[in-house]
Design a protein with these regions (language model features):
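Extracellular/virion structural assembly segments
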Residues: 1-207
């Protein structure tokens, strides 16, 4: 479920800080010739630390109830980071084609003329049917084949099946609470709630 914010709920506050952390468990093994062997110990995931200003009662109630409801029903907490909302790419992504069998750290999008504009390096990217959020590391347009190739970090969490479409806007991080504990109610003498924070980690479905 979507984390309440000013875009979706008039009573919801915006956060004052959003610390996005790259967690990429890698094992490094130095070889006799001096080279370093890198082995992925587990899948990469993003974690997110959200901090909020002092909250009025209704603001606190909206946020805490949403968190408790997500825990109750076993749902993810979906977070939009407004600094990545740029709409550099528009058009009709449903008319593009992502062929089946793609894996690794890049993706090729066919029928690219259905899209207008181009993403910047560092923009977020998703594909339909996948929960993982990626960052764009490179962009190559091939006019002859009417395709674009995006370099992605991290690598694709699962192999494409040919039904996916690209997502460049309104990208949601599908997160869960790190310890499934709701934030503490810290009410001061002025009736304001202090120190509301959320520590979340990405919930990646790689099946």
């Amino acid at each position: 479920m979507r984390l309440p914010d000013p875009f979706t709920n008039a009573d919801a506050p915006g956060f004052t800080g959003a610390r996005l952390v790259d967690n990429n468990p890698v094992i490094y093994d130095e070889m006799p010739n001096g080279s370093v062997l890198r082995v992925d110990g587990a899948a990469q995931f993003w974690s997110l630390e959200l901090t909020y200003p002092e909250l009025f009662y209704m603001e606190f109630a909206v946020l805490s109830a949403a968190v408790m409801e997500a825990i109750r029903v076993g749902d993810t907490i979906d977070v939009l980071l407004p600094q990545y909302e740029n709409y550099r790419v528009t058009g009709n992504p449903n008319s593009t084609v992502i062929t089946a069998g793609q894996k690794g750290n890049q993706i090729v999008i066919q029928n690219a003329s259905a899209l207008n504009g181009r993403p910047n390096i560092g923009d977020l990217f998703k594909i339909t049917g996948h929960s993982k959020v990626y960052k764009i590391t490179s962009y190559t347009l091939n006019n002859a084949s009417n395709s674009i190739t995006l370099g992605l970090y991290p690598k694709l969490a699962k192999i494409t099946d040919g039904t996916e479409k690209p997502i460049f806007n309104n990208i949601l991080f599908e997160m869960v609470l790190v310890d499934d504990t709701i934030p503490t109610e810290d009410l001061d003498v002025n009736g304001m709630y202090q120190g509301f924070e959320l520590t979340l980690r990405e919930n990646v479905h790689a099946e």
